[in-house]
């Protein structure tokens, strides 16, 4: 995805080709590696830029060079290598453990700032949360939503415990290890369905219906997060109670969402990036974990599905869509 296309879709952005640096006043360059498409970041990048601004960086004194994998994770190593060859001053990986791993494999000298959903110590990205060491730091959610999503969905739809669907992306190399707890807990009661491209969603929902799933959890993962609207439309068509990680899912008609406030994460990543450009070493910036989560319930969808939302659940909701 080149600069002209990006600006047309996202709006004003400081995105100049790295090769053009010699033709302009030298400014620091931020390489941004994204596993998904441009559209998935439209609502989040302003928070990233705001974090940069608070550390002294805005259009005119910093260049931002984007690389988009468009959901094709096998492209990430080459895209990361391209940013390294272009001599980016810092590389930011916006979403997905596989993205951070690709950047880490590409360089052990250029600073890297990540957002991931797994334990960075177990993955070998950092030495510890408090003292990352090396050239990498960032934010992790440690895939904390699987158990909480199950708890919330069972409270909303108790019968889902008898037959629960789980939607995953098989293209993600971490899928097996991250869904293992659900498989171990539910055994034969779990209906595992997959989607690695947009054309896979319809067959996945058809399989859920055929197997008698009474509810569905969408695994928190960059590609699946970026297709929240499409998943919501299918959930409505198949009358399937579904919980997702991203707020847009509930806004689009899905039953409910529970997850981090992505604007907060992107804002903090912007701050970390700016601090690194100002001279702070990634090794001295602790890996952060989010402390704020949002539960959004679409009451209109619940009524259409014949679900009486428990008052205890409504009382805990941060937002109720009526």
Where are these regions (language model features)?
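Short hydrophobic alpha-helices and adjacent helix-cap/hinge residues
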Residues: 1-322
């Amino acid at each position: 995805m080149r600069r002209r296309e990006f600006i047309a879709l996202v709006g004003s952005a400081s995105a100049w080709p790295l090769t053009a640096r010699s033709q302009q006043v030298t400014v620091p360059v931020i390489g941004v590696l994204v596993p998904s498409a441009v559209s998935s970041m439209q609502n989040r990048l302003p928070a990233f830029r705001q974090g940069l601004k608070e550390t002294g960086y805005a259009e005119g004194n910093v260049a931002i060079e984007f690389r988009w994998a468009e959901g094709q994770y096998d492209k990430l190593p080459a895209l990361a290598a391209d940013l390294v060859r272009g001599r980016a001053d810092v590389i930011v990986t916006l979403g997905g453990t596989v993205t951070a791993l690709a950047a880490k494999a590409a360089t052990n000298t250029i600073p890297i700032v990540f957002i991931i959903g797994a334990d960075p110590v177990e993955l070998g990205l950092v030495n510890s949360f408090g003292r990352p060491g090396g050239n990498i730091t960032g934010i992790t959610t440690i895939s904390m939503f699987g158990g909480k999503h199950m708890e919330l969905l069972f409270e909303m739809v108790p019968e889902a415990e008898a037959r629960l669907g789980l939607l995953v992306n098989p293209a993600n190399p971490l899928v097996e290890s991250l869904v293992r707890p659900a498989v171990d807990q539910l055994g034969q009661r779990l209906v595992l369905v997959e989607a690695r491209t947009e054309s896979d969603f319809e067959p996945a929902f058809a399989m859920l219906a055929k197997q008698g799933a009474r509810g569905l959890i969408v695994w928190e993962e960059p590609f699946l997060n970026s297709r929240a609207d499409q998943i919501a439309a299918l959930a409505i068509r198949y009358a399937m109670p579904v919980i997702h990680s991203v707020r847009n899912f509930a806004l689009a008609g899905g039953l409910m969402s529970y997850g981090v406030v992505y604007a907060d994460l992107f804002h903090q990543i912007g701050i970390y990036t700016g601090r690194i450009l100002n001279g702070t070493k990634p090794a001295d910036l602790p890996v952060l974990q989010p402390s704020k989560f949002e539960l959004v319930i679409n009451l209109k969808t619940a009524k259409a599905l014949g679900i009486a939302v428990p008052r205890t659940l409504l009382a805990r909701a941060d937002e109720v869509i009526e």
